[in-house]
Amino acid sequence: MNSLENLILVGVIKSCHGIKGHVMLKSFTDPATKILERNLVNESGANIHIKLISQNAKGELICTFNDIATRNEAENLKGYKIFCLRASLPELEEDEFYIADLTHLPVLNQDHKEIGKIKNILNFGAGDIIEIEFSNQTTELLPFNKEFFPIITKDYVILNYQREA
C-alpha cells in the first residue's frame, strides 16, 4: 500500500463516453498520451489498466478502463483519480517541479515573510496559473512566471507582487 506522498496525480476520469464502458480521461501529463507510458495505480496502490481508444480535440483521452464494459459501470467512475508512483517519474531539470510538489508550499514576500500558501495550480490552455490563498483568507490568481515568482524552491516560493489594499 502506498501513501499519497509517494503518488503523483496524473489524471482523472471526467465522464463516461458511449455505451461500451469507455471513459473520458483528463490527463495531467504533457503530452496527454504520456500517461499511458506509466504504471498507473489508484489511491490504494492497486494497478489500473487503461487502453487508448482515441483522443478528442481538447486533448482528452477516450479509453477503456480495467474491466469496465457498460455505460452504467463507467458512469460510476466520474471523478476517479489516477496516480503513478513518484519513484517512477523522470528526474527534473533544476527549474522544473511537479504540480504536487508546489501545491500547499508557503508563499513568501520579498522580505521572506510568509504571506500565504499555494492553493492550486490551474491551466486553461494559455499557461499555468497559481492560485494563492493569502493569510487573510483571500485568494488571487497569478500567472506562473519568473516575473511574479522569481525564486522557487522545494520549500517555498517568493512572490514579487504588491497586492492592492
Swiss-Prot record:
Listed InterPro entries: PRC-brl_dom, PRC_barrel-like_sf, RimM, RimM_N, RimM_N_sf, Transl_B-barrel_sf
PRC barrel domain mapped to chain residues: 94-165
Gene Ontology MF terms in the entry: ribosome binding
Keyword Glycoprotein: no
Record Pfam families: PRC (PF05239), RimM (PF01782)
Any one GO cellular component localisation term in the record: cytoplasm
GO biological process terms, semicolon-separated: ribosomal small subunit biogenesis; rRNA processing
Localisation: Cytoplasm
Alphabetical UniProt keywords: Chaperone, Cytoplasm, Ribosome biogenesis, rRNA processing
Domain characteristics, as noted in the entry: The PRC barrel domain binds ribosomal protein uS19.
Function recorded in the entry: An accessory protein needed during the final step in the assembly of 30S ribosomal subunit, possibly for assembly of the head region. Essential for efficient processing of 16S rRNA. May be needed both before and after RbfA during the maturation of 16S rRNA. It has affinity for free ribosomal 30S subunits but not for 70S ribosomes.
PANTHER family linked to this entry: RIBOSOME MATURATION FACTOR RIMM
Family the entry assigns: Belongs to the RimM family.
Subunit structure, as described in the record: Binds ribosomal protein uS19.
Protein name listed in UniProt: Ribosome maturation factor RimM
Source organism: Rickettsia conorii (strain ATCC VR-613 / Malish 7)
Phylogenetic placement of the source organism: Bacteria, Pseudomonadati, Pseudomonadota, Alphaproteobacteria, Rickettsiales
Gene coding for it: rimM
